[in-house]
């Protein structure tokens, strides 16, 4: 018997998102007119499907202080968040990092790849998000459609000047913090009903 697979398209409201499942895509228009695609990555986790421009982790070649001290954190939560629609900003649930909170954040090495030696002593590791278990979903393209490497928030545990990143082919690596590279951020949303292939790991 033949089968057919269809993809539903419907209007979307950040305040009342309805039932979502990993892999669902949400097309949104930024305040500067650019169109971006967000994707459901795990229970309560949404992130960019591809890259939103380029930025450095720090002005200098250092990873001292990790995510909490880096320039990328400031850039996302001051400049990038100002581009998001007000309805989306209102729906975002801040995420705690130690004693501080961020609405937007980069993914950690473990959230993308699962267990990895470079960050084994990093307390800010999390667990691998369901979406990234498929290596193809780790490959991100820029506005021209070209695959490019992109930053993670995890400092390289064996280096004082580099952060982890994802190669253009989806593999793991790290690079000096002052280099400009792809930006792919994530966020939590306030409330929704999710469908997931397996239960969400505890945070």
Which sequence ranges carry the predicted segments?
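Collagenous Gly-X-Y triple-helix signature in extracellular proteins
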Residues: 2-203
């Amino acid at each position: 018997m033949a089968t057919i697979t269809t993809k539903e398209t419907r209007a979307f409201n950040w305040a009342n998102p309805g039932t979502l499942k990993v892999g669902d895509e949400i097309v949104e228009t930024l305040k500067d007119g650019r169109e971006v695609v967000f994707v459901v990555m795990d229970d309560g986790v949404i992130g960019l499907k591809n890259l939103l421009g380029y930025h450095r982790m720090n002005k200098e070649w250092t990873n001292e202080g990790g995510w909490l001290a880096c320039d990328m954190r400031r850039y996302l939560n001051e400049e990038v968040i100002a581009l998001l629609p007000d309805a989306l900003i209102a729906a975002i649930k801040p995420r705690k990092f130690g004693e501080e909170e961020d609405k937007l954040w980069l993914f950690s090495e473990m959230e993308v790849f699962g267990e990895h030696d470079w960050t084994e002593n990093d307390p800010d590791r999390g667990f691998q998000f369901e979406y990234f278990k498929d290596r193809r979903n780790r490959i991100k393209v820029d506005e021209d459609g070209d695959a490019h490497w992109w930053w993670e928030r995890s400092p390289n545990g064996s280096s004082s000047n580099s952060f982890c990143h994802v190669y253009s082919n989806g593999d793991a690596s790290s690079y000096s913090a002052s280099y400009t590279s792809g930006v792919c951020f994530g966020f939590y949303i306030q409330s929704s009903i999710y469908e997931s292939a397996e239960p969400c790991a505890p945070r």
